[in-house]
A protein has these predicted regions:
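Short histidine/acidic/glycine/proline-rich micro-motifs that form metal-
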Residues: 52-54, 80-84, 114-117, 148, ...
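C-terminal cap of thioredoxin/glutaredoxin-like
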Residues: 133-204
């Protein structure tokens, strides 16, 4: 019994230590929710990003490994920021890739093209050529790029980028309640997100 009591105290103290590591105002901020959150028992995590962002590029492999570890009670999505013309063009590229079901391979190819090959994808024609190099027919690319659905999603990205006051990327949001800005260490950022997921689960 004594050993069990000591173990319980140790676990409790360890948990308190972990929780004390993260402080509101220093490691994360509480925000006024501008994202409609569906209370379906799942915690919603959003990453605001831009393909042209070097920090987002270096974060991507760590983020993908983290995503694969998420349980069914957490859902993750990306929000391509749409501050100006080039960001809006890349947001259109993001949603076109989604519509073409190219998935993570497509997104990784974009990051590599920009940051490793110097192909900055600054026009519709450049995007058509790039997606063609991935084996997608030009007609299919143009159909999705110019679709009502993709245009509406880009419009939503513009609105959310403003409402969420995204002033740097990568930036992450948990349940439309907490904001976490980029950290020096990618794992530190995800440790904070894991902490916020844990405290949000009872409220989802």
């Amino acid at each position: 019994m004594r050993a069990k009591s000591i173990l319980f105290i140790f676990i409790a103290l360890f948990t308190l230590h972990i929780d004390a590591q993260f402080q509101q105002g220093r490691d994360y901020q509480r925000i006024s929710s501008v994202i409609p959150i569906k209370k379906d028992g799942k915690v919603e995590v959003i990453e605001a990003f831009w393909y042209g962002c070097g920090a987002c590029f270096s974060f991507e492999p760590t983020l993908n490994r983290w995503k694969s570890s998420l349980d069914n009670d957490t859902k993750f999505s990306k929000l391509p920021v749409a501050w100006g013309p080039i960001h809006q063009l890349h947001a259109k590229l993001f949603y076109t890739i989604e519509a073409l079901n190219l998935g993570n391979n497509g997104h990784s190819a974009v990051f590599n093209a920009i940051h490793k090959e110097g192909n900055y994808l600054t026009s519709d024609n450049a995007i058509v050529d790039f997606l063609g190099s991935l084996g997608v027919e030009e007609a299919d690319v143009l159909k999705q790029m110019n679709s009502f659905s993709v245009k509406q999603k880009v419009k939503r990205s513009i609105e959310l980028s403003k409402k969420l006051k995204v002033n740097g990327v990568p930036m992450m949001f948990v349940d439309g309640t907490f904001k976490v800005q980029a950290q020096r260490n990618h794992n530190d950022m995800l440790d904070i997100i894991n902490y916020l997921i844990k405290i949000q689960k009872p409220n989802s």
